[in-house]
Amino acid sequence: MSGVWVFKNGVVRLVEKQQATAGTAVAGGRRKALVHTPSGQVVSSYAALEARLTALGWERYYEDPSLFQFHKRGSLDLISLPADFSAFSSVHMYDIVVKNRDSFRVVDA
């Protein structure tokens, strides 16, 4: 049983955790999507994300098969993502946005 306990009008109830579709994350009951700002396109796969990050100077690490990792040469930044794109959450999206402020943003899907 997973979800969030909600207290409203003196009543406590459990709201079941929603299943997110691939490439979206549920935060506060709203789905999130990662958008490549220059093109306005939603990132819908790791292949699309890898192409965008590579163009920005990020290099892919292949050491750990359970993670999808990128490093930017000349910096200490590392982006670590779950190997399964369906587990890609808003936390991962915001990590990408913070490290690439002008290139990505997170929006309500």
UniProtKB/Swiss-Prot annotation:
Alphabetized UniProt keyword annotations: Cytoplasm, GTP-binding, Nucleotide-binding, Nucleus, Ubl conjugation
InterPro entries, per the entry: FPF1
Keyword GTP-binding belongs to the record: yes
Post-translational modification: Ubiquitinated. RPT4 mediates its proteasome-dependent degradation.
Subunit structure: Interacts with RPT4.
Domain remarks in the Swiss-Prot or TrEMBL record: D-box [RxxLxx(L/I)xN] is the common motif recognized by the E3 ubiquitin ligase APC specifically acting during transition from metaphase to anaphase.
Annotated protein name in UniProt: Flowering-promoting factor 1-like protein 1
Organism: Oryza sativa subsp. japonica (Rice)
Gene: RAA1
